[in-house]
């Protein structure tokens, strides 16, 4: 008799995705981040659900409802901080996951890669709207500044912004709709993640060498289930260290001041995971130019597969490309740092140089490095 997990219509899907999945034998810990993102998403949906039970999306009560969750709801404080810091862990895993894809040439799986880019954009939108919900100073002004960027779109810009706001400023209508979108988007992310996985399992996983491993596979369970469990335990350890010891480390103190449209905070800045894009936005003096650069800083990932000029897939055996990759990583850290600094000398020029470098590395230097390596292989 065949095992039920191989015949049952539902269990068969789970079996083919997580148990009997043929997996390359040499995938490293960089391949753990996919499962960690799944865990992060489940954690965010669960904590978010319990927060939504006590939260009110009204400008007069939103701030106090969050305070109520932390003070009066049983374990409300831990749920709130797990949700807030869970978002940070989510983005750490996302950046590592994308970085892995860039380094090992996983972007040659076009459908998987493009759905991944859509997932990244959707997650960024969700996180932005979630940051508005506590209705603190940084929530209000962050929402005002970022939604206002759409007014840079010629002709329809102003109408579009007012349509998103539901009025002539960020107000009750804006908060209510942001809560509605923030609630629904994680489920859309979950659906997209399933499609992401579906396309990945059409081709099978890449591996560090970038060489097809179809002749050499091992079952996902128990080898990678146990490896994933180790990753999950480490993720939860780091998250709980953050939550229990320094819950406000990654937050902004200004968000403990209730939203006040009449008082602008001295430095409006988003959460740390958006700072690199914010730095690129600020580095261009023109409004429309800044918005375009901001959008392109993420959408440039769609171009990466078409800029691949190397004869090899992975960067494992390409030292010049490796140098370019790590310069890009350092550049992104520089942009993240600049995004959190005030707009003054020398930060302005550093931000502008780092922004130019970002696009230059991806569009010019990486393809050039690959071409040089191709020619070196002929010697």
Swiss-Prot record:
What does the record list as GO biological process?
A: mitochondrial electron transport, ubiquinol to cytochrome c
The cofactors it requires, by name, are:
heme b
The region annotated as signal peptide is: none
Annotated membrane topology is: Multi-pass membrane protein
| TM spans (from-to) | 33-53, 77-98, 113-133, 178-198, 226-246, 288-308, 320-340, 347-367
Provide the residue positions that the database annotates as binding heme b b566: 97, 196
Give any GO molecular function from the UniProt entry.
metal ion binding
What is the protein name given in its UniProt record? Cytochrome b
């Amino acid at each position: 008799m065949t095992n039920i997990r191989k015949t049952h219509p539902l269990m068969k899907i789970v079996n083919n995705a997580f148990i009997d999945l043929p997996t390359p034998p040499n995938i490293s810990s960089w391949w753990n981040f996919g499962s960690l993102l799944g865990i992060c998403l489940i954690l965010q949906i669960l904590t978010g659900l319990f927060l939504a039970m006590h939260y009110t999306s009204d400008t007069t009560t939103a701030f106090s409802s969050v305070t109520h969750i932390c003070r009066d709801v049983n374990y409300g404080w831990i749920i709130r901080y797990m949700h807030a810091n869970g978002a940070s862990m989510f983005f750490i895993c996302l950046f590592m996951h994308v970085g892995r894809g860039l380094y090992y040439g996983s972007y040659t799986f076009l459908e998987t890669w493009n759905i991944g880019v859509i997932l990244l954009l959707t997650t960024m939108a969700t996180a932005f709207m979630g940051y508005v919900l506590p209705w603190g100073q940084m929530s209000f002004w962050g929402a005002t500044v970022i939604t206002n960027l759409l007014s840079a779109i010629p002709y329809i810009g102003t109408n579009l912004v007012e349509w998103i706001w539901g009025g002539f400023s960020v107000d009750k209508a804006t908060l209510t709709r942001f809560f509605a979108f923030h609630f629904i988007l994680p489920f859309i992310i979950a659906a997209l993640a399933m499609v992401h996985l579906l396309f990945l399992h059409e081709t099978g996983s890449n591996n560090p060498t970038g060489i097809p491993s179809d002749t050499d596979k091992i079952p996902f369970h128990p080898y990678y289930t146990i490896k994933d469990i180790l990753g999950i335990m480490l993720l939860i350890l780091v998250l709980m260290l953050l939550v229990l010891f320094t819950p406000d480390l990654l937050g902004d103190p200004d968000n403990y001041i209730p939203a006040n449209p009449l008082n602008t905070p001295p430095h409006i800045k988003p959460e740390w995971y958006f700072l690199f894009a914010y730095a690129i936005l600020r580095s261009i003096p023109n409004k429309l130019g800044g918005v375009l650069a901001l959008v392109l800083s993420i959408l440039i990932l769609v171009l990466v597969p078409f800029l691949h000029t190397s004869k090899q897939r992975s960067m494992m055996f390409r030292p010049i490309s490796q140098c370019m990759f790590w310069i890009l990583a350092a550049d992104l850290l520089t942009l993240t740092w600049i995004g959190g600094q005030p707009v003054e000398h020398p930060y302005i020029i550093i931000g502008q140089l780092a922004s130019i470098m970002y696009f230059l590395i991806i569009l010019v230097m990486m393809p050039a490095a690959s071409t040089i390596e191709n020619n070196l292989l002929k010697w």
